[in-house]
């Protein structure tokens, strides 16, 4: 699988984004979904065209004049049988273009323990929900939890907030979910109807979405199963995973579904976590995400929460274009004693963590939640379980302040997540150039619901966001078999221009590189303030020797708040004893952040907090720069 940016950067909804295309050595699979654009006419014309050719139709909300045609009578993997339908559409004089959607794989991120134990619980599971309130149950570490109790005591339970679960459907008849189900905001994109109920299978494989929904919105005090993180929130089902192949049009439609009703979208799926896949959103989905953060929630931006991945130490979530997107909040997981789960992937794009299981045989160490057909379970797990917990915490924050933008939520995540008692046996905790503590696996720490709602209540919207191409290295350079290739790039971060970026949020290194064995590549980038981000770690199962990375946007959040001006360093090398060859053809530095200090006007309640530290840092920097400007002015006059 090959991924990269074409036409390098595309503008949509006032934002720059990388248009990613993918090529595979395998024969493409063609589906019964078509992207159709008409020469003229509106939705009524599209319905007429669709009906004449035997298609159903939906208008795409994120793009003017584009329609989703679907033909339920077509075999999903037969190019020959569907070709004449495509040709008939193309020959219709009203149709400008008709693109048949290719199918690709998307996997649920649920970890299935080989020692699964059947447990039928009739009693409420609240005392077993250690990730909500950890008192040491299931051999856990007391106090290592989401601190939801503090948020609940302050009166925040998710009222007025809707979370969309993009998955295999939800059991909206479940007695622990029914009272919080938002039917108006729900849809089934697998069957094209408004009833996203899971398809029955003997092995309950399609329980994934129902379990995620219960973590967020299971009702409280009804003697059924457990309690959702935001137990007064509404949950919407967006069924989109349960078909033989995923398509760009289904993903884009799901991500852009009802953006004025749905506040938070939770995704516990992504490309295959096999340690050798490089994949991400296609063009329509990228466009839908850009549209979501720019226009969703009345212009405040849809909040996308993504599970970082279940590939373990064999994989790297920077090879997943969903988890490593600037527009998503990528969430990893810890187990109940603070260690990493066996399936956790590490990467520089992860923003924070919540909880799941993964190492322990204790049957109560899993995540307790709702299950299919009115049942309960103690066995939900994987980063699949982590993302909905985060969505629930964000729902509590939104209730505290409905004016929060998608960027505000990311800033709050950075500032209120805590190291707590998290322990990473491989990667140390470090501080970036402005003193923010981060970890390559856990991001900025575990979410703290109490701290987040308290800060959210007084939060002032962060300054406008700008995008700067900080520079580019285009000369091909060979990567030595031993040692490292070191490249440097000095940037002024567009200073003096209208898109100057002074305070960093996200940084992307767009890299084109080939190697005799892609999985042995290691790429690090160091900022001018000395923060080292591991952009790519070794993936021992990735034996690609042909496609490499083609304009792939590696992303880091570790330089959050730093000054981008100065010299950036990129190091590329091989891990392992086998001789290797490689060459880097391009490195483009993309800087995203604000010109004005984001925290100077924020209200500080806790003078030991990261906000207090960051605000002090900003004030000192602003003072230093003001003094420097004054000195230059005085010297200029003399």
Swiss-Prot record:
Pfam families: P_proprotein (PF01483), Peptidase_S8 (PF00082), S8_pro-domain (PF16470). GO terms for molecular function: serine-type endopeptidase activity. Disulfide bonds join 225-376, 317-347, 468-494. It catalyses: Release of protein hormones and neuropeptides from their precursors, generally by hydrolysis of -Lys-Arg-|- bonds. Residues 461-597 form the P/Homo B domain. Residues 129-453 form the Peptidase S8 domain. It comes from the Eukaryota. Serine endopeptidase which is involved in the processing of hormone and other protein precursors at sites comprised of pairs of basic amino acid residues. Responsible for the release of glucagon from proglucagon in pancreatic A cells. Belongs to the peptidase S8 family. Furin subfamily. This is Neuroendocrine convertase 2. It comes from Sus scrofa.
């Amino acid at each position: 699988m090959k991924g990269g940016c074409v036409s390098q950067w595309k503008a949509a909804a006032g934002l720059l984004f990388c248009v990613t295309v993918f090529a595979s050595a395998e024969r493409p699979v063609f589906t019964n979904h078509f992207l159709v654009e008409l020469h003229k006419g509106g939705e009524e014309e599209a319905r007429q065209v669709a009906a004449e050719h035997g298609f159903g139709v939906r208008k795409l909300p994120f793009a003017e004049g584009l329609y989703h045609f679907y033909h339920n009578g077509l075999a999903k993997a037969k190019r020959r049988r569907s070709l004449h339908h495509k040709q008939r559409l193309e020959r219709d004089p009203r149709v400008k273009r008709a693109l048949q959607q290719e199918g690709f794989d998307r996997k649920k991120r649920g970890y299935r323990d080989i020692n699964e134990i059947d447990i039928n619980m009739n009693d409420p599971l609240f005392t077993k929900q250690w990730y909500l309130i950890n008192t040491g149950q299931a051999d856990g570490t007391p106090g290592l939890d989401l601190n939801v109790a503090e948020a609940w005591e302050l009166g925040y339970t998710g009222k007025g907030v809707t979370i969309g679960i993009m998955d295999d459907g939800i059991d909206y008849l479940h007695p622990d979910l029914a009272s919080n189900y938002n039917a108006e905001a729900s849809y089934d994109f697998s069957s094209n109807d408004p009833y996203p109920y899971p398809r029955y299978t003997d092995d309950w494989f399609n329980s994934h979405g129902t379990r995620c929904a219960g973590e967020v919105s299971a009702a409280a005090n009804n003697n059924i199963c457990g309690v959702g993180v935001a137990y007064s929130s509404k949950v919407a089902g967006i069924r989109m995973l349960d078909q033989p192949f995923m398509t760009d049009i289904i993903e884009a439609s799901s991500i852009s579904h009802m953006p004025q009703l749905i506040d938070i979208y939770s995704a516990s799926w992504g490309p295959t976590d096999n340690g050798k896949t490089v994949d991400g959103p296609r063009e329509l989905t990228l466009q839908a995400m850009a549209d979501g953060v720019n226009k969703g929630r009345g212009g405040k931006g849809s909040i996308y929460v993504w599970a970082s991945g279940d590939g373990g130490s064999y994989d790297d979530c920077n090879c997943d274009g969903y988890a490593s997107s600037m527009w998503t909040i990528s969430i990893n997981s810890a187990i109940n004693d603070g260690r990493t789960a066996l399936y956790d992937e590490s990467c520089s794009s992860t923003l924070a963590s919540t909880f799941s299981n993964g190492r322990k045989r204790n049957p109560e160490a899993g995540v307790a939640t709702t299950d299919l057909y009115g049942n309960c379970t103690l066995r939900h797990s994987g980063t699949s379980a982590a993302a909905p917990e985060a969505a629930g915490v964000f729902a509590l924050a939104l209730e505290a302040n409905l004016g929060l933008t998608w960027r505000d939520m990311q800033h709050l995540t950075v500032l209120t997540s805590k190291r707590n008692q998290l322990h990473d046996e491989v990667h140390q905790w470090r501080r970036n150039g402005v003193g923010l503590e981060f970890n390559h696996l856990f991001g900025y720490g575990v979410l703290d619901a109490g701290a987040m709602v308290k800060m959210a209540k007084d939060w002032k919207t962060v300054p406008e966001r700008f995008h700067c191409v900080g520079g580019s290295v285009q000369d091909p350079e060979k990567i030595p078999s031993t040692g490292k290739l070191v490249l440097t790039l000095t940037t002024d971060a567009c200073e003096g221009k209208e898109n100057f970026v002074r305070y960093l949020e996200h940084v992307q290194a767009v890299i084109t590189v080939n190697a005799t064995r892609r999985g042995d590549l290691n790429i690090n980038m160091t900022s001018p303030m000395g923060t080292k981000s591991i952009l790519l770690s070794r993936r021992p199962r990735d034996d690609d020797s042909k496609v490499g990375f083609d304009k792939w946007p590696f992303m880091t959040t570790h330089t959050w708040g730093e000054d981008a001006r100065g010299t950036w360093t990129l190091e590329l090398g091989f891990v392992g004893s086998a001789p290797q060859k490689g060459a880097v053809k391009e490195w483009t530095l993309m800087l995203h952040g604000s010109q004005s200090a984001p925290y100077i006007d924020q209200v500080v309640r806790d003078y030991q907090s990261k906000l207090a530290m960051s605000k002090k840092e900003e004030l000192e920097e602003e003072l230093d720069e003001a003094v420097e400007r004054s000195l230059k002015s005085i010297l200029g006059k003399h």
